[in-house]
Amino acid sequence: MAISEATELLVKLTNLQAKFQKTLTASLSVHGISVTEYLVLRRLDQAPDKKLRRIDLAQAVCLTPSGVTRLLNPMEKIGLVSKEAGARDARVSLVAIAPAGETIYRESSVTFADTSRELLASVSKNDRESLSRIAEALLKG
């Protein structure tokens, strides 16, 4: 059975994502967080009022609502995030970055940036720009 070009590309992209996630999580472990937790803190830090509905956060970090809940529970226990009821609707669960989460996010952003540079060091600036455009198109599609 012939393997399609699309299949081969997706296998390479999946392996690349796994490599990046493993390397970034290892680097971020000195801050006590994983790459997925970093992405949650990053998204919350960038959000208006530094809070989001749980479902919007899940979508922003490409997790299911139950997956983001499983991720947030330990983060809440160690004080990185807090959960709040929505001002307009108490049934809506909001997640906010806590002060400790802001500190960890700021400190870990330096590590994330350094590791990102190392991971992409062999790729030219033009290729990085092209890859960024391709990634944006794939994420939208």
What are these regions (language model features)?
Residues 1-31, 78:
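N-terminal leader segment of winged-helix/HTH proteins
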Residues 14, 42-49, 109, 136:
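Short, locally clustered residues in the helix-turn-helix/winged-helix DNA-binding domain
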Residues 54, 72-73:
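Short, hydrophobic-biased segments on the C-terminal half of alpha helices
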Residues 22-64:
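N-terminal helix-turn-helix DNA-binding core of bacterial DNA-binding proteins
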Residues 1-4, 125-141:
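C-terminal regulatory/oligomerization modules of transcriptional regulators
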